[in-house]
Swiss-Prot record:
Organism of provenance: Chlorobium luteolum (strain DSM 273 / BCRC 81028 / 2530) (Pelodictyon luteolum)
Residue ranges crossing the lipid bilayer per the database entry: none
Domain of life, source organism: Bacteria
The name this protein goes by in its record: Ribosome-recycling factor
Function noted in UniProt: Responsible for the release of ribosomes from messenger RNA at the termination of protein biosynthesis. May increase the efficiency of translation by recycling ribosomes from one round of translation to another.
């Protein structure tokens, strides 16, 4: 194993951390309807708890409305209750075998809460990135102790680790700014 291998492995881990962050912020409400809003909703179905996507189809009806097509008519009430109880501030209304979820406009206070939540997720993501950088540096130092790489390679590896961290932290900051803009948009 050399510095390049360690660097590539760490870069893959950092990319996964960014993907996880993107997935987390996708479920934060903005003023618009997106199917990701209901990703975390769990429904009590058939004696177990399952994700909403396993009991129905979620789609966007218009900019302020989601439409959930429940596959089993007996699950409509449980699905409606799960959406209401998910603490997302949504108003589901059953219509036959489907549920119309109207997305009310966000209050200024609620927008600020969502911005804080976005920043918290961003900070958690940065901590994860820093941990991957630390692991990369430890692996490089271990290789140097085993005489598998030279001191120059170690220094280059540490610089690579710092460069990777800065690149991915910049990406997190850009994603945070973009999400904040979406949230604060009226």
């Amino acid at each position: 194993m050399n510095v390049k291998d360690v660097s590539q492995k760490s870069e893959q881990k950092m990319k996964k951390a960014i993907e996880a962050f993107q997935h987390e912020i996708a479920s934060i409400r903005t003023g618009k309807a997106t199917t990701a809003l209901l990703d975390r909703v769990k429904v009590e179905a058939y004696g177990q708890t399952m994700p909403l996507r396993q009991v129905g189809n979620v789609g966007v009806s218009d900019i302020h409305t989601l439409l959930v097509q429940v596959w089993d008519k007996s699950m409509v009430a449980a699905t409606e209750k799960a959406i209401r109880d998910a603490n997302l501030g949504l108003n589901p209304a059953a219509e036959g075998q489907s549920i119309r979820v109207s997305i009310p406009p966000l209050t200024e206070e609620r927008r600020k809460e969502f911005v804080k939540l976005t920043r918290k997720f961003g900070e958690d993501s940065k901590v994860s990135l820093r941990n991957h950088r630390r692991d990369m540096i430890q692996e490089i130092e271990k290789l140097e102790k085993e005489k598998a790489i030279s001191e120059d390679d170690r220094n280059r590896g540490k610089k690579d680790a710092d460069d990777l961290l800065h690149r991915f932290e910049k990406q997190v900051n850009e994603l945070i700014a973009q999400k904040e803009k979406e949230i604060m948009e009226v």
